[in-house]
Design a protein with these regions (language model features):
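Conserved NTP-donor binding/palm subdomain of two-metal-ion nucleotidyltransferases/polymerases, i.e.
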Residues: 1-110, 116-343
């Protein structure tokens, strides 16, 4: 059975694709992994079957529309929060396109994600609600859980534009075993000149690796790993010693192992040119046996776009909850959620 390795190879080396490629399978995989716009950008200008070329042209147009929408939402948030005088850091896809980074080319962008100081959360929430955003989660338990334990406010959606915003005060749940220093992330952010900022190049990768390996179950992880590939390649091109800057930043936030594993996986799947520092132990790229399990999870997609390898996916789902909270809290949380679902 096919897996998403064909998609990873197509992204890494578009010229390797033959005209008789299983285009239907490749496109279906890319759509399921939210990488269709990215694939369309990577294949632009190459000889393609006519129907594939038309489909990918539409995908590029859709990605461009998504880019404009994301930037407009960022501007709306900026206007709502400007009177507060608090730093507002764009995260994820919106940050990539706002900063003009390669990782933003064709990228699928969903919610607007921002990072603000924790002490400003109440004021930020009030300002957004006054500007037309409203709560998505009316359930009192979910609302209380977010506010006490999560790294973000309960999600908000704009009443007229139907666009969501996630307001973060750090990058991992407060229950996680790792506690990144959000104050450092905000202090080191790069100003865009319009009242908004983005994380530093190293912090962007740290955040992406945290989201990929220290928080979630790797669902949609191929897109996150492609982000890391692009971000690293662009930063290392400007600074050959960027790898050392990156691992220093990762260590500051307790995410050294996650970042190094992400670099290994990116190298293995996309051929990312990462300079190793084996002797110092700072960047060891020698494959680990467990890397195979992560690759197996990342590539768990068939040419019909269906998720495959259910046992592997379940194992990583359990792992994600184990990383997010202590066992006793996890058991209590799952029990409450199960009981409420039966009510």
């Amino acid at each position: 059975m096919a897996d998403a390795l064909i998609l990873a190879r197509a992204l890494a080396d578009p010229t390797s694709l033959a005209l008789d490629t299983d285009w239907a399978g490749l496109v279906t995989m890319a759509r399921a992994e939210q990488l269709l716009g990215t694939l369309a950008w990577r294949l632009h200008g190459l000889p393609l079957p006519e129907d594939v070329a038309l489909l990918l042209s539409d995908a590029r147009a859709a990605a461009e529309n998504g880019r404009r929408t994301a930037l407009w939402e960022a501007e709306m948030a900026r206007r709502a929060l400007a009177p507060l005088g608090v730093p507002v850091v764009l995260l994820k896809g919106t940050a990539f396109v706002a900063a003009g980074l390669a990782a933003g080319q064709g990228r699928s962008i969903g919610d607007l994600d921002i990072l603000v100081p924790r002490e400003a959360l109440d004021a930020v929430e009030a300002a957004l609600i006054a500007a037309g955003w409203e709560w998505v989660k009316p359930d009192p338990y979910d609302d209380a859980y977010y506010r006490r334990w999560m790294h973000e406010l309960p999600p908000l959606i704009h009443a007229e534009r139907d666009r969501m915003i996630d307001v973060h005060h750090t990058i991992l749940p407060l229950t996680a075993r790792v506690r990144p220093d959000a104050a450092v992330l905000i202090a080191d952010a790069v100003q865009l000149g319009n009242g908004l900022s983005v994380l530093s190049p190293a912090a962007m990768i740290v955040h992406a690796a945290a989201h990929l390996l220290a928080d979630g179950d790797l669902a949609g992880g191929l897109r996150n790993l492609w982000d890391i590939h692009c971000l690293y390649g662009e930063a290392a091109e400007d600074d050959p010693a960027f790898g050392l800057t990156l691992v220093e930043e990762a260590g500051r936030h307790g995410l050294h192992d996650a970042v190094v594993r992400a670099l290994r996986l990116s190298q293995q799947l996309f051929g990312t040119q990462v300079r190793a520092y084996e002797s110092s132990g700072r960047i060891r790229l020698t494959p680990r046996w467990s890397d195979r399990l992560f690759r197996r999870r990342l590539l768990a997609r068939d040419d019909w776009g269906r998720a495959t390898r259910p046992v592997t996916r379940l194992a990583f789902y359990v792992r994600s909850h184990w990383l997010r909270m202590p066992p006793a809290m996890l058991a209590r949380h799952l029990w409450i959620k199960w009981r409420r679902s039966k009510a």
